[in-house]
Amino acid sequence: MSVLSIKNLTYKIDDFALKDIDLEINQGEYFVLLGPSGSGKTTLLETIAGLTSSSGEIKFGNELISNKTPEQRDIGFVYQDFALFPNLNVSQNIKFCERYKKEIKSKQFFDELIDTLNIKHLLNRPIGELSGGEKQRVALARALYAKSKILLLDEPLSAIDPTFKYQIIKQLKELHKHYHLTTIHVTHNFREASYLADKIAIIINGEIKQIGTPNDVLTKPKDLQIAKFLGYKNIFSTSILEIETKHRYFSINPNLIKIYQNLQDNQTDFYFDGVIEEYIWDTDHLKLYVKVNSNRFFIKIPKIVLEDFQMQTDQKIRLGFDKKDIYYL
């Protein structure tokens, strides 16, 4: 059941625009907006929260909220830089919503929240004395204490020490389930999105390019632009395959390419002769770069497969792959 509906949302400033955004977000869903820097992720969150004006329609259930103030929309927002009030201590920051939502005051819920987030010992601390991870938990507590209908998270892990990121990601997932939240989370990190999301929307240059489950979006990009953003390797024109196809481009997984020293080997559906440009030995595999005419193939091969393989730069080599392993774009 859709709890948040966005129709034809448009916003323009200077040379940037959000272009006719349509989204349906279901009750209890962890929805991730995934895109590169400058793609409009944060701007879209701000328009949903009412912090930035836009045209189009935003509904919560059957209620139109696009004409309401941020306070009236009842949406919790955790900013990338946390946006905590430096003149208030931790406890005062968390309870700030009591100033405009008198009915929210609840000692029992407050106590449960600070125990869940393990911040009881921080309540009287000034904000300036907190670490990045502590600020993040306080910002989460403030958003949750307001008992908002929807929680918006803007790159919540960007200011966190990498050592604690997994711990925070795990906690976000647990909080989402524990408090039965509907969450919209902005990130540029694929692993973060894959771990957290029920559904992912790819946003590039202000446009929603693809929406689906993490498996569908991350393993089946709809077009070349999405594939490049997702870091797909070995994207080539289908003309090199010399077959009839409606597709212009294809990609082949580096782990599914075979190599042969004997240039007469043709055990795969497609094979190409090239020259080794570079090779790098890793812990348990080899990274190999092979130039085939104007194309550069990246190949990953387990060390165990290469026991009798002599490797050197400028060496001629044959590479091959099967039709079933091709992903068309």
Question: What does each model-identified segment do?
Answer:
Residues 234-235, 239-280, 304-329:
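Glycine/charge-rich catalytic "coupling/switch" loops of P-loop NTPases
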Residues 64-79, 100, 221:
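ABC ATPase NBD coupling module
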Residues 14, 53, 68-69, 88-107, ...:
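ABC-type ATPase nucleotide-binding domains, specifically the catalytic core motifs of the NBD
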Residues 64, 105-122, 173-174:
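Conserved ABC ATPase "signature" region
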Residues 145-149:
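A short, proline-enriched helix->beta-strand linker immediately N-terminal to the Walker B motif
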Residues 126-130, 134:
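Conserved ABC ATPase signature
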